[in-house]
Every structure is written in C-alpha cells, then in structure tokens.
C-alpha cells in the first residue's frame, strides 16, 4: 500500500475518535466547568420558600432570588475549552420567579413555578419548578415537613461568546456571531424542614437541610467568522448537601413575606424574598 493511501486510511479510521474528542465534553467534579454549573444550581433550585404549614391553602406569589457571581478564574474553562478566556456568566443580578401553591388530598401540598421565555439582558429562561411536601405537627407549635422538588427547563444566553468577545481580536469568538448557548439545570432533591411559631403565629422561623442531585447540561451554540457552528455539549453529574433557613412574616390575614437563605456549602449562598397572598375565599 502506498504512503498516501496509508495516511488516508488512518484519517478515515481515526475520524470518529477525532470528532468525539472535539465534540461532547464530560468534565469531572473538580473542573471549573462543574464548579460554575454548581453555583448556577444554588439560586435555580426550587427551594421551599416558606415555613412549614399544616393548612397552606391556595397561594400565589413572586420570588426574587439573588444570583451569586462566578469569578473570572472559575469561569475560565479547564477541560472543555482549555486556553479560552472566562465565559460570560454574570448576566443578571437576580432571578424573579412566580410561585403557586395548592393543597392536595392526604395532607399533601403542591407548589409549582414557571418562568416564561421572555428575553431580559440577553437571557431567556423557560424554567419549571415543582415540589410535593407533607407536613406534620400541631397548630401553633413545631411543624416538620418533608419535601421532594425538581427544577427543569432551559436558559438561553450568550455565555460562550458575548458582544465584547466578538470584538476581541485575541479571542476565538472574534468576528463571529453572538452565541445563544443553552443550559438545562436538571435539579432534583429532597429536604426536611422544621418550623416554629412566634408572635402569636405571625412570625414563623424555620430551618432545614437537604440533598440535591444535579445533572446540568450545557450546549454551545456559536457560529465563528468562517461560518462554522460549534454545537458542543458539556455534561456534568453532581451531588450536593444544602442548608437553608428563614422566616415567614404574616403581614395580614392573607398576605405573607418570607426571607430565606439557601446554601450549598461547597458552592455558594443565595438569598430569597417571597411575597405570597391567599387565593380565593
């Protein structure tokens, strides 16, 4: 066999491996990619956002969660795109999220949330949150609650190549089009909370702990100056302990305000404010 034929055969045989090496990426838990996505998961997790309640009723409300910043050092890829500068991760200061709650048979409570796909500062979220819980205790005393929750959907944003990177001649983004990358948080968890009652039941402090299973998926969507589109996927699986605490203040008979701190000790801390009102008679 001639030398050119040998070279051609080697390229053909090696092509699938080459494509895989330049395609999907599976960084380990100690990589910057995994650590950054774990930080994103802290404010995106569908936390309880209220004190355990034996008689919750129908509720509607709005949550505002602080989005912890990712440092430039941590936003710099270490596995999937080595040599690239920091990703554009700090796009918003806070995340608003509507919440709805309703009682179910057997003393269960369902909470749900949906962030509609409206683009704000380049970010478009289409996120859903669900939780199912069961509370135990006595009115006016200690109340415990066990809860399962999930967050799923997607967020689109120019994370890989924002406008500034497109104008940076030293960046691989230079001369391309602004990326519209997608991250799917895929958070599932269990938690246990304990709450009390003060000020005649108007102030109800609570605290607890839980476990979150994180399966975030990130997909690049960037077209460079040569018209080549990068559709690389980044897959991470993580397990996290979470701690939380807060208090619900009953402002009126129908209106309540909750402040909550929610933390993954190895990643970040977020603060939440949730205003709720009773719905119906």
Place the predicted regions along the sequence by residue.
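Residues that define the transmembrane beta-barrel architecture of outer-membrane proteins
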Residues: 54-56, 91-96, 124-128, 184-188, ...
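Repeated loop/turn-to-beta-strand initiation elements of outer-membrane beta-barrel proteins
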Residues: 106-110, 139-144, 202-205, 253-259, ...
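Transmembrane beta-strand segments that form the barrel wall of outer-membrane beta-barrel proteins
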Residues: 108-120, 128, 144, 255-266, ...
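Membrane-embedded beta-strand positions of outer-membrane beta-barrel proteins
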Residues: 60-62, 100, 110-112, 132, ...
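Extracellular/periplasm-exposed beta-strand and loop segments of Gram-negative cell-envelope proteins
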Residues: 72-77, 82-91, 119-123, 150-186, ...
